[in-house]
Amino acid sequence: MVKDTTIVDCVRCGAQTKTGGQCRRTTCKYHKYCYQHAKLIHGLSIRKSRLPNSGNGLFAEKPFKKGEVVALYSSEETKEAENDEDKSGYGWETKKGYIVDAASTQSGMGRWSNMCRKQNQQSKLCKGNNVIGVTSRNPVKVQFKALKNIKSGDEIYVSYGRDYFNER
């Protein structure tokens, strides 16, 4: 029997209740809010992706208008060689040789976005990527902006970039 050695660090949700106290639910230490508050505050949820073999995906729980920020990464920029996270597929390249580590940020809900690849479009599983990653500096952050209007219930899809599959 194989023993699961995965450690999940849980913390209390960072949201306040209506009475001003702290929410009693827990969340992964890398996400500030529990599922219910992430849905209320960010208008997003994480659940099983519609794409086969893609694990979880990010879903809109409210409509987003074209150009609106849907999700973001905000963490320190590190050199890829210094960071093991780039091997997991959750690092977002901000410039050549540098990434933002989506696994160590509390606003990294964008890390759950999958890519709508051509074969998935042809099989009508998705209709193309609906957000684009935009990097800004001082401080470094990556914003996922809507390429078109997104309806509540839509899965969020972003292009991983040309180099992503070349490196795999």
Describe these PLM feature segments.
Residues 12, 33, 59, 63, ...:
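Beta-strand cores of modular interaction/reader domains in eukaryotic scaffold and signaling proteins
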Residues 22-26, 35-36, 46, 72-73, ...:
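Intrinsically disordered, low-complexity regions enriched in proline, serine, glycine
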Residues 41-133:
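Catalytic cores of histone-lysine modification enzymes
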Residues 6-10, 117-168:
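C-terminal SET catalytic tail plus cysteine-rich post-SET Zn-binding segment of SAM-dependent SET-domain
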Residues 2-8, 25:
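Short, flexible, mixed-charge glycine/proline-rich loop motifs
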Residues 11-40:
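Cys/His-rich Zn2+-coordinating "finger/knuckle" modules used by eukaryotic regulatory proteins
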